Design a protein with these regions (language model features):
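Short, surface-exposed ligand-recognition loops at beta-strand->loop->(often short) alpha-helix junctions
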Residues: 20-32
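Active-site-flanking beta-strand signature of metal-NTP-handling nucleotidyl enzymes
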Residues: 10-19, 66
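An amphipathic, aromatic/His-enriched active-site/gating alpha helix that lines ligand/cofactor pockets
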Residues: 34-50, 60, 68-108, 115
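A short beta-turn/loop motif at secondary-structure boundaries
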Residues: 55-61
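Short flexible/disordered coil segments
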Residues: 2-3, 15, 106-115
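Surface-exposed beta-loop interaction hotspot
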Residues: 4-9
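Short structured motifs
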Residues: 1, 50-53
Length: 115
C-alpha cells in the first residue's frame, strides 16, 4: 500500500510518562500547568501548532500522563527542539527522584478527521 503525503503534512510528537506514585504524577502535572502556556508561546513562533497535556486514566493502579505536540513542517519540528530541550532539562532536574519511564514517539500525520 502506498501513502501519498502532502509536503506540508503535520508532524507530531507524543510522549508517555509513567510514574511510580500519584504524588510524582501530580508534581509533573503542576510543572506543566505552571509552564506549559509560556513554553507554547515560544514554540508557536517556531511553527508548533498544538500542545496537549493529558492524564491517562484507563489503566487502574498506574500513574501516567502524556504530552502531544504538533508541528507545521519538518523545519518547524527542528526549530522547536532547542526550546523543548531547555525546558526538559529544567523539568528533569525537578523530577530527578521520580524515576519515571518516558516513551517517546515521532509521528507523521497520515489521516486526521475532525468535526
Amino acid at each position: 500500500m502506498e501513502f501519498l503525503l502532502d509536503i506540508k503534512a503535520n508532524l507530531m510528537t507524543y510522549n508517555t510518562f509513567t510514574f511510580k506514585t500519584e504524588a510524582q504524577m501530580l508534581l509533573f502535572k503542576r510543572i506543566w500547568e505552571d509552564n506549559g502556556t509560556e513554553l507554547f508561546d515560544k514554540l508557536k513562533k517556531k511553527g508548533c501548532t498544538r500542545f496537549c497535556l493529558n492524564q491517562i486514566w484507563n489503566v487502574k493502579g498506574t500513574f501516567k500522563m502524556s504530552v502531544l505536540f504538533e508541528y507545521e513542517s519538518p523545519t518547524s519540528f527542528k526549530q522547536c527542539q532547542n526550546e523543548l530541550e531547555n525546558f526538559t532539562k529544567n523539568l528533569m532536574k525537578e523530577l530527578q527522584a521520580a524515576d519515571l519511564v518516558i516513551e517517546e514517539s515521532r509521528n507523521i500525520v497520515l489521516q486526521d478527521l475532525r468535526i
